[in-house]
Amino acid sequence: DVEVKLMNEMRYDAATIGNHEFDFGLDNMARIFREAAFPIVCANYHFEGTVLEGLVRPYVILERKGVKVGVFGLGTQLEGMVASENYKGVTYEDPVTAANRVADELKNKEHCDLVVCLSHLGWDIDGLDDTELVSATRHIDIVLGGHSHTYFEHPEVLKNADGEDVYCNQMGKHGRYVGMLLLEMSPTGD
């Protein structure tokens, strides 16, 4: 509750879902998500038939200074990490599949100038992480990550499936650091 109130005061544009959001079950998540003054986005958890149906979107499109920004979220595999009764009815989709589908929609159908992934997959961990996600996907420009509690002093730049640069950043844990990423875009979108 305190976190959402602070996020509201800080005027967050969007947030995604981490494994700890499931710690107290779906009813608690729904209550907290209703308090959020910003959208909750996650493209690879599907909530049809649960109390979270309609509270979580796959993505949101923001307009900032004439730049159209598509923002979507991804969550980690819950099985083995969260008690199964705490995510009953939630369907998990492979993050790479979900990311490619949504990023393509944002870039090619919605014509977003910039596509940002809010990832809770982690960095340099066993299993699918942000490094593997980037190398297997297209159309993502920035990955703002979490889960592994990694702190980057400067963004890491990785190559996507097309050999294009993707900027990745993480700010550790417990709100110890606040990140700021300044982007310059040319009129052609470069």
Report residues per predicted region.
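Acidic, metal/ion-coordinating pockets
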Residues: D1-D190
